[in-house]
From Swiss-Prot:
It comes from Mus musculus. Pfam families: hNIFK_binding, RRM_1. This is MKI67 FHA domain-interacting nucleolar phosphoprotein. The gene is Nifk. GO terms for cellular component: condensed nuclear chromosome; cytoplasm; nucleolus; nucleoplasm. Expressed in brain, heart, hind limb muscles, intestine, liver, skin and spleen. The lineage of its organism: Eukaryota, Metazoa, Chordata, Craniata, Vertebrata. There is a cross-link at residue 293 (Glycyl lysine isopeptide (Lys-Gly) (interchain with G-Cter in SUMO1)).
């Protein structure tokens, strides 16, 4: 039994002349016993679908699970902003079958999804770029802008000196290049000049200051003209009228008749009434002087409009 163990030896015919026939019969028997070969799978053409007008709240998992209901998905990419990482509102889905992709494009176009009408279109092979799905699984990292951070960082005194030295060196090279090409162009220095002492700068500013002439005013005109201009302006401004607190004259046409005293008569003599505007047309009226009595006459007084009685004056004795 130990001699029978091992790999199977090739079968040989008992009659060497019938060896060829024996091999043919053996191959036929082996062909019958073998399992039937599986049919080769047909290669399916893949189809890409463009999805637009997507809500910004949807993520990759939501869209992938929704589109997987129609068929197998080979690749998927949701476009995102490189600066913020937010969704741009469109995506690309690649199905394993082109027929499935066309069916999805027909059924999902103008479909109301999240208060928006989806734009779903089938993309032919010519329009599909080879790098369309290159960054489909890349994780988003917020950009750091290292160059901007380096430029805006706080520098010490030694670093500032090094920076000024580099700027001066670049400025010299630039001026040499312009001079070599025959370009006469002057531009300010890249490094600001160092500020001088405050006291020295103040003196220089006072020395270079142009003060107005003593004979001239602040406006540049002579002082006499300036004074006349101020007077003209003040005269043109209307002045407020002051309320006169002078007592009204004792003579009133509507009031009670005054007492005829010597002083009253002298005052009446001196009054002059003007009839016209010219001096030649003036008429002077002189009233006759009545006889003066020692006792003053008592004149009857009319009742005042307010209802108050006038005070009685005591007669002089």
């Amino acid at each position: 039994m130990a001699g029978l163990a091992g790999p199977a030896k090739p079968s040989l015919a008992l009659n060497p002349q019938e060896d060829s026939q024996f091999e043919k019969a053996l191959t036929q028997i082996q062909g019958r016993t073998k399992k039937p070969q599986q049919k080769k799978k047909e290669k399916l053409n893949r189809g890409v679908v463009y999805l637009g007008h997507l809500p910004s709240t949807l993520s990759e998992s939501h869209i992938y699970n929704y589109c997987a209901q129609f068929g197998d998905i080979s690749r998927f990419r949701l476009s995102r902003s490189k600066r913020t990482g937010n969704s741009k509102g469109y995506a690309f889905v690649e199905f394993e079958s082109e027929d499935v992709a066309k069916i999805v494009a027909e059924t999902m176009d103008n479909y109301l999804f999240g208060e928006r009408l989806l734009s779903c279109k089938f993309m032919p092979r010519k329009k599909v770029h080879k790098d369309l799905f290159s960054q489909r699984n890349a994780l988003f990292h917020r950009p750091s802008f290292p160059a901007v951070k380096r430029y805006n960082r706080k520098r010490g005194h030694l670093q500032m000196l090094k920076m000024e030295y580099r700027f001066k060196k670049k400025e010299k090279l630039l001026r040499k290049k312009l001079a070599a090409k025959g370009i006469d162009y002057s531009f300010p220095s890249l490094v600001l000049p160092k500020p001088k002492n405050i006291a020295v700068a103040h003196r220089d500013s006072e020395g270079n200051q142009v003060l107005p002439d003593q004979k001239e005013g602040l406006s540049g005109e002579p002082r006499r003209k300036e004074k006349m201009m101020k007077e003209d302006i003040s005269n043109n401004i209307p002045k407020k009228r002051k309320r006169s607190r002078r007592k009204k004259s004792s003579v009133d046409s509507q009031g009670p008749t005054p007492v005829c005293t010597p002083t009253f008569l002298e005052r009446r003599k001196s009054q002059v009434m003007e009839v016209g505007g010219d001096k030649d047309d003036e008429i002077i009226l002189k009233l006759p002087v009545p006889p003066v009595k020692e006792d003053t006459q008592k004149t009857p007084t009319s009742a005042s409009p307010g209802g108050k009685r006038p005070r009685k004056r005591k007669s002089k004795q």
